[in-house]
Amino acid sequence: MAAASTNRLRLLYTSTRASLPQSTPSILTTRTYATTDSSTSATSTPKPRRRTAFTDKLNAGPSFGDFVSGNNDNAPLIDPSEAYALETALVGPAGRKKQMTRLPPWLKTPIPDSKNYQRLKKDLRGLNLHTVCEEARCPNISDCWGGGDKAAATATIMLMGDTCTRGCSFCSVKTSRRPAALDPHEPENTAEAISRWGLGYVVLTSVDRDDLADGGARHFAETVRKIKSKAPSTLVECLTGDYRGDLDMVALVANSGLDVYAHNIETVEALTPRVRDRRATFKQSIAVLEAAKKANPEVITKSSLMLGLGETEEQLEHALAQLRAVDVDVVTFGQYMRPTKRHMAVHEYVHPRWFEHWQRRAEELGFLYCASGPLVRSSYKAGEAFIENVLKKRRAGVSDAVAEKKVAAAVDEAAR
């Protein structure tokens, strides 16, 4: 039975095949290559794509030529100068756009790429040193590191690592409860780098190290002594933390051989809890500056404030009065610039004329010097040029008043 069924299937297949028209197999006679001339290539009709609402809308919209020529009648024309003058801009995806404040033109700086910048960076990496210029994303880095002479090539060395135990809302330095151990070779390496550069003035600062019993004060003092040993003519400014209010540690650093003791109050008293870490208070910072002056009356004391955080004129007047009450010699004002979106937002970009106003006000109150401007930072080189000259005049036995007059031109030149 199975054999009969198989025979019937064979007969059906044979008869069906015989009834179909016989065709000769097609032979491919042409080949197409990526470089074949279009005249010799086999022509093929592309498969049409499925139309979508997005495609229709895109095709019906303005072309590139419309954007270039400005022939879009549906949108008002904006002069390029007006476009750059816009103070705010909407950014983000549709439905979630946020209004962001544009950076005003007086705060824009060039990207650092000079040979001197690369040389300083290479030296720092080779000696495993850190700078606040890089860690805090200072906008002046191209200016301070870009020059070829000692006045223009200024670096602020950050001691005790690149990780802080505190987390201020304005600062971009890394934070941790337990940073890495101190590098015992750092004081020697720092002194070696500074003597190699031949700078007349150097700024040392540090992260806060609340994990250490002395807050790193002895490490700081040892670095100053090493620098003075290798480069005795170099003037040293130390921008320190508050050492958790331990005034004995403040005195230790103040008597280490430095020339300028700096500690920043950062902002006015009313805004301090919001701007700074909870362990840093306005009154504690004032006490640090007072203790430094008492420990070493010959040392120049210095502090700095950021503007644009929402402070009022009355609050700034109060802050300046508190600084003068403890005989602070130098004060600087600079614009707060948000380092990342995770940090505190800028309340306002203060116009340069207000920085001029606060410079005049500080001088009226009796400060020895005030550097004030949107891009001024606590280690700004114009202030350093002034302090450097004043200290050298002091060493030569010239009075402060005479020194101020003689270096006024140099200060103005450095500020430019």
Curated annotation (Swiss-Prot):
Keywords: 4Fe-4S, Iron, Iron-sulfur, Metal-binding, Mitochondrion, S-adenosyl-L-methionine, Transferase, Transit peptide. Pathway: Protein modification; protein lipoylation via endogenous pathway; protein N(6)-(lipoyl)lysine from octanoyl-[acyl-carrier-protein]: step 2/2. Gene3D superfamilies: Aldolase class I (3.20.20.70). SUPFAM superfamilies: Radical SAM enzymes. Residues 147-368 form the Radical SAM core domain. PROSITE patterns: RADICAL_SAM. One of its GO terms (cellular component) is mitochondrion. Its EC number is 2.8.1.8. InterPro entries: Aldolase_TIM (IPR013785), Elp3/MiaA/NifB-like_rSAM (IPR006638), LIAS_N (IPR031691), Lipoyl_synth (IPR003698), rSAM (IPR007197). [4Fe-4S] cluster 1 binds at C133, C138, C144, S379. GO terms for molecular function: 4 iron, 4 sulfur cluster binding; lipoate synthase activity; metal ion binding. It catalyses: [[Fe-S] cluster scaffold protein carrying a second [4Fe-4S](2+) cluster] + N(6)-octanoyl-L-lysyl-[protein] + 2 oxidized [2Fe-2S]-[ferredoxin] + 2 S-adenosyl-L-methionine + 4 H(+) = [[Fe-S] cluster scaffold protein] + N(6)-[(R)-dihydrolipoyl]-L-lysyl-[protein] + 4 Fe(3+) + 2 hydrogen sulfide + 2 5'-deoxyadenosine + 2 L-methionine + 2 reduced [2Fe-2S]-[ferredoxin]. Transmembrane segments: none annotated. Residues 20-52 are annotated as: Disordered. Residues 1-33 form a transit peptide. It is found in: Mitochondrion. Its cofactor is [4Fe-4S] cluster. This is Lipoyl synthase, mitochondrial. It comes from Aspergillus niger (strain ATCC MYA-4892 / CBS 513.88 / FGSC A1513). The lineage of its organism: Eukaryota, Fungi, Dikarya, Ascomycota, Pezizomycotina.
